Amino acid sequence: MPVRPFQVKVPEAELTDLRRRIAATRWPARERVTDRSQGVQLGTLRELARYWTNEYDWRKCETRLNALPQFTTEIDGVDIHFIHVRSRQDNALPLIMTHGWPGSVIELLETVGPLTDPTSHGGNPNDAFHLVLPSLPGYGFSGEPTEPGWESGRIARAWATLMDRLGYTRYVAQGGDVGAAVTDAMGRQAPKGLLGIHINLLVASIGLEDKLPAKSEQERAAHGAVKTFTTDGFGYFLEQATRPQTIGYSLLDSPVGLAAWLLDHDTDSYYKISRAFVDGEPVGNLTRDNIIDNITLYWLTGTGASAAQWYWETGRAQAAARAAGQASSSGLGQGRLHDVPRRDLRCPAQLGRDGLPRPRLLQRDRQGRPLRRLGRTGALLRRSAGRIPATTLMVPLSSALPGRGFDADSGH
């Protein structure tokens, strides 16, 4: 299949329609509580809508995207959009990075310079990567699958096809959130040429509380924190995993409704986003424009519903695996990094204060050198079964570097 150049060109009429729809929003009454326990607060969303309508300029984001080499290619019947930036260094290691939900390739743009041109960012030529940044199927400018079955494993196989199509015979993979699940699947599949993986989302299956040994109050408090999230902070996951089509009608009809849905996925990042709009105090790169760039991309591409489908696909795939007696992992979801009971986790050290997507973790890991070392010693990472050892690579490399990587005040 051919690889075709791609440029973002949004008609002005679509931007005019977006502003009209925002202005026509039917607002509910203010929440009855002082926190966000009932959902996105009215004050935050009204200020976001005001800025979106009166001050925000999508063309800046469009220009930023079009400054990078973008392409599309058909894989398994779906058009896949991707950014492909080759380093000037001939010995650069190819790296495919995958975003998550509610994100997009926009959240990866700030990594392009440091990873492809490390000498300009405090590194040396040997730190360089050739970057491939695909949009997940049903996200951004990628096409929407027309049949079920596009869970992480199928996407992982598509990514291996993409890297092969680009001529890469040795490469590494990185991902966060949904991208972490896809990257983990790549590690388990171990396609020819994949040397190693790096993820910035830990996943684990936590035992039932009544089965836990009574070791300490801290252990049980940690289990309680996880339970609170899975019962009170898991709404987005449950809806998208069970009824993505139902919520999809609202996400494609109301830009403000879409914004609220994308903001309401975890408490810590929500409050940071709220600070950017209500207080005018962005945290790290969580600026008003960066936040709305991502929301606008979802709106203009009409992918609010199709992006949610991954959760449904994943739930069905996990259920099928359990029914077949196969192991399946379940994530703690997005949000803060929970203090997980140590009985259930072999790397129990707290890795940070929140769970914001952090693609720059790889950049901060000594300019990605741990992954480059995999490029030189990848043969050592393969078991006799030919699989990459997930127990080694499931842990973010930053966990070995105290004070590096997860920075609560640095934004994405």
Tell where the protein language model's regions lie, with residue ranges.
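Glycine-rich "HGGG/HGxG" loop immediately N-terminal to the catalytic nucleophile
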Residues: 60, 121-123, 136-150, 184, ...
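Alpha/beta-hydrolase
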Residues: 1-16, 21-22, 26, 193-298
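The serine-hydrolase catalytic nucleophile loop
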Residues: 101-113
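Non-catalytic accessory segments flanking enzyme active sites
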Residues: 14-86, 91, 290, 299-321
